Amino acid sequence: MSCVLTGVVPLGLVLLLCGAQGFFLPNVTQLEKLLSKYQGDQPHSRTRRAISRADREEILTLHNKLRGQVSPPASNMEYMTWDEELEKSAVAWARECIWEHGPTSLLVSIGQNLAVHWGRPRSPGSHVQSWYDEVKDYTYPYPHECNPWCPERCSGPMCTHYTQIVWATTNRIGCAVNTCPRMNVWGDVWENAVYLVCNYFPKGNWIGEAPYKTGQPCSECPGKYRGGCKNNLCYQETYGQETETDDMNEVEAAPIPDEKHVWVTPRVIKPKKPKKDSPVNYMTQVVKCDTKMKDKCKGSTCNRYQCPAGCLHSGAKIFGTLFYESASSICRAAIHYGILDDRGGLVDVTRNGKVPFFVKSERNGVQSLSKYKASSSFTVSKVKVQDLDCYTTVAQLCPYEKPGTHCPRVRCPAHCKDEPSYWAPVFGSNIYADTSSICKTAVHAGVIRNESGGYVDVMPVDKKKTYVASLRNGVQSESLRTPRDGKAFRIFAVRQ
């Protein structure tokens, strides 16, 4: 083996905003395989943590201390808390003993800092401090320099460890330490290398953005903090309620409290009328062979239609070729264009502006007519059907573009509700941010059942200024205010 001097190597991560849509998250099988590494053989077995309580406290305390003393001061820096799920994902990667960021499938959702050393013992806090010390090479980009994107001001080899630590909206962290018997570090094999992995959520290091807003500390905290401020950090009082009390850092079942009996007079409850089921919204409209585009398209959901069988020999008229006049039969136009046959099926419609004239032609057994008068037009396209995992977003699948975007009809697997929000987030209610998991959103909206999954239709729309959180069907969505990028979507049930 090569002789390597005792040393420390950090590794930082930059996530490209423009490239995030290119990532696809793991399917259920891969995720279960990853999470199975955290689970013992017995559901209540005692297992020692991959990081000691002292190291955990040191890492978390130092992060919050450093975040509270940035210069220039931050107006929106959030207090950071420890997250068990992030710790588990860090444990899984640390045990791989691979000197690179990973796993790739998770990097779309999390930020990550890495460090490794061998020889003389070092505390995890010393690595955190070395990450932060990159500040000496970093110049903060003030608002007037961002037009709209902020310049990258790093005069050293790397500043991304520092920027991830002080990324204002990153408010959760989970780390793990693992001793690797043999670890390849840039071509050299280190024996008994101590590997530190820290995962962060929400991720930071977005290219073109400043890590935080500058100003009076806590003057621009998100509304959920309700004015709370501690050591220059946006703070919620609930943070102080520590639940873990085991100083040995072992996980075991909590003791059952002593049983107490409270005698009360039972209250008489009047029977309530059964609640009416909420109306189910469908994007796909069921039409007849003679249904005209101008008669049916009178709302936002007029871009997908279910045509019946037997329209080939219907007497319904169509006008034009490729571009069809709005008085044309939707289903006959789809057969003329070659999207459907006489068996019927799904067709997507795109509304267009006025066309000066429409030319007749005969295609696929359907004769269209001419009309030499300017009129509104539409085009037709085939509806694809695609299977998804629990993590795919509209931003990845079919982001909104003007004048409109058609998404495939998608089939969601079962049990997406159980996926953690780091990998399958949901932002909003009724109208959702397009960075939300499609299938978990479908459960939240009530268009599919979590136990069975199923087909859904999605409609990309332009972005909203705010997305409001809500708890529906066992799924807690998150709020999102004034998003700089990204669009939105609506989600609909499919008739079975």
From Swiss-Prot:
One of its GO terms (biological process) is face morphogenesis. GO terms for molecular function: glycosaminoglycan binding. Glycans are attached at residue 27. SMART domains: LCCL, SCP. It is found in: Secreted. The keyword Glycoprotein applies. This is Cysteine-rich secretory protein LCCL domain-containing 2. It comes from Bos taurus (Bovine).
